[in-house]
Amino acid sequence: MIQQDPGALYSDHLAVLFRRAEQALARGGFDHLVVPSGTLHYQVFDDRDYPYAVNPQFKAWLPLTRVPNSWIVFTPGKRPAVLFHQPFDYWHVVPDAPSGWWVEHFDIHIIRKPEEALALLPADPSRCAILGEPQSALGSYVPNNPAPVVNYLEWHRGSKTPYEIALMRQAQVLGVRGHRAAEAAFRNGADEFSIHMAYCQAVGQDATELPYGNIVALNEHAAVLHYTELGRKAPQPLRSFLIDAGASAHGYASDITRTYAARGHDEFAAMIAAVDAAQQQMCAAVRPGFDYKQLHVDAHLSLMGVLKDFGVIKVSPQTALETGVSAAFFPHGIGHLIGLQVHDVAGFAASDEGGRIERPAGHPYLRLTRVLEPGMVVTIEPGLYFIDMLLNEVKDAGHGDAINWDRVDFFRPYGGIRIEDEVLCTEGEADNLTRPVFAAANG
């Protein structure tokens, strides 16, 4: 596994962004692309701010995630500018002076107060496509987020540049480091909060730096898809552990899930192994031209095959799919685009002009409906869960006879299983970004 230097790839990445921005501006009829980094948000009736989250459109250009009140200005034919907010402040740590692989490519203007940007932004705000949230408005420079510009940029963000893939590989390395520490803590009998802390320590990122809230679920808690409570006391006995957690690398996310059985719980361990084998086949199906919607449907059939083999369902996988039984055990989508955002944008877009590709009927939580293209990075995250609310709905719909309820009772205390990798669609075979990192770490 070779890690490429992102700095050596940045110039080509920027050239791609230039071309995209020029075309997007032409589509929208604007002269300038203006991207604010975002501002701090404060809690209601309080002077405490929420953790700052940078505008994704900003960090697409710069590997900076902690520079509120800054701006990027791109005008075709001109060198892009960065208005870098570095205030005089003795209450807080201010951003370091600009440095790194990006600085030589921009005209950099240091501003000490947010309003100093006004003299450096393009003269006519009406000629600017300003991409950001309303709170980023400064004087007459109010984010307008023109649809032709946003649609074009978001669609093409689906195809990652080599620079972006290099950073995503870095995020995998960090995430796997945390996952290994978390598994070790679980094996030592730790509670959910302690497992979470072991993860953060290994990654070197706290909860505000991680790309999403860690899901650290012991036993039945794994049946809550987005369980983030972090219990302070380990259940007894410990049966199972599901962890869905990622890491950030210069604004790019990883999103990795693993499930483990405690020692002595061999049948659940065998089910995990079966889901893992099925998941690897799904990862291999990531090829250019393949419809992600079909991959999702195929995942349902494969997972129902696992349940059939373990005696949980009595009907065929196809019947389970057609009757909605499969959705009770696998109630989320097979995955999503990932990159600057965990659930990256334009997953439903019909083209770079907009439009929408709807989800298949009966699958309301699928987050990607596009045909796969080279450069896309997607998650593949099949799961099987024992969720009473959904299983009761199967009974209410008259399909209770399709399920062996004794087997459900056996597996319910384990909560569920989810296995998730990130996979790069190439011109040929799928490139799993996650598995080789685990293999190297375990080697």
Curated annotation (Swiss-Prot):
GO CC terms of this entry: cytosol
Molecular function via GO: aminopeptidase activity; metal ion binding; metalloexopeptidase activity; phosphoric triester hydrolase activity; proline dipeptidase activity
Q: Which cofactors, by name?
A: Mn(2+)
Positions contributing to Mn(2+) 2 binding:
D244, D255, E420
Q: What is its EC number?
A: 3.4.13.9
| Entry note: cofactor | Binds 2 manganese ions per subunit.
What PROSITE patterns does the database record attribute to this sequence? PROLINE_PEPTIDASE (PS00491)
InterPro entries, A to Z = Creatin/AminoP/Spt16_N (IPR029149), Creatinase/aminopeptidase-like (IPR036005), PepQ_N (IPR048819), Pept_M24 (IPR000994), Peptidase_M24B_aminopep-P_CS (IPR001131), X-Pro_dipept-like (IPR052433), X_Pro_dipept (IPR022846)
Question: Would you say which domain of life the source belongs to?
Answer: Bacteria
Catalyzed chemical reaction(s): Xaa-L-Pro dipeptide + H2O = an L-alpha-amino acid + L-proline
SUPFAM superfamilies the record matches:
Creatinase/aminopeptidase (SSF55920)
* A Pfam family it matches: PepQ_N
Keywords for this protein: Dipeptidase, Hydrolase, Manganese, Metal-binding, Metalloprotease, Protease
Q: Which residues bind Mn(2+) 1?
A: D255, H336, E381, E420
What's a BP term from Gene Ontology annotated to this protein? proteolysis
What is the role of this chain? Answer: Splits dipeptides with a prolyl residue in the C-terminal position.
Q: What protein family is recorded?
A: Belongs to the peptidase M24B family. Bacterial-type prolidase subfamily.
The protein's name: Xaa-Pro dipeptidase
